[in-house]
């Protein structure tokens, strides 16, 4: 499948809570979670090289509609609800349409 919709979030954890935030975000790959959906073709959790409490999440979806539908579900909302308590402030969100590139993990 091809990702026609991408989503990126930059989240800053409370000091020293970056590991917990990463662990929570990685549960998004568990069976029944958003990243395990057939419509999610990219789910990448990364950290800032200079600040371990800054975490980036990049997602690629088959469509914007699929992204919104899956994230409206119970599993996604449970993760989102738990994230709030780990954050130092507001997160940055960006959505975009891929043009071309490569991901080889």
Where in the sequence are the language-model features?
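Glycine-rich beta-strand-turn "strand-cap" elements at beta-sheet edges
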Residues: 1-5, 42-53, 79-105
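Short, well-ordered beta-strand segments in beta-rich or mixed alpha/beta enzyme
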Residues: 5-11, 42-71
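Short coil/turn motifs at secondary-structure junctions
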Residues: 14-16, 62-64, 100
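A broadly tuned "polar low-complexity/structure-edge" signature
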Residues: 2, 18-20, 32
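Short, surface-exposed ligand-recognition loops at beta-strand->loop->(often short) alpha-helix junctions
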Residues: 12-25
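An amphipathic, aromatic/His-enriched active-site/gating alpha helix that lines ligand/cofactor pockets
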Residues: 27-41, 60-94
């Amino acid at each position: 499948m091809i990702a026609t919709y991408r989503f990126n979030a930059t989240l800053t954890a409370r000091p020293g809570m970056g590991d917990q935030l990463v662990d929570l975000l990685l549960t998004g790959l568990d069976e029944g979670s958003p990243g395990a959906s057939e419509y999610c073709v990219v789910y990448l959790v990364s950290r800032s090289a200079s600040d371990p409490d800054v975490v980036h999440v990049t997602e690629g979806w088959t469509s914007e509609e699929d992204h919104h539908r899956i994230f409206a579900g119970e599993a996604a909302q449970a993760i989102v609800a738990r994230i709030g308590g780990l954050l130092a402030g507001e997160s940055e969100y960006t959505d975009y349409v891929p043009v071309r590139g490569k991901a080889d993990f």
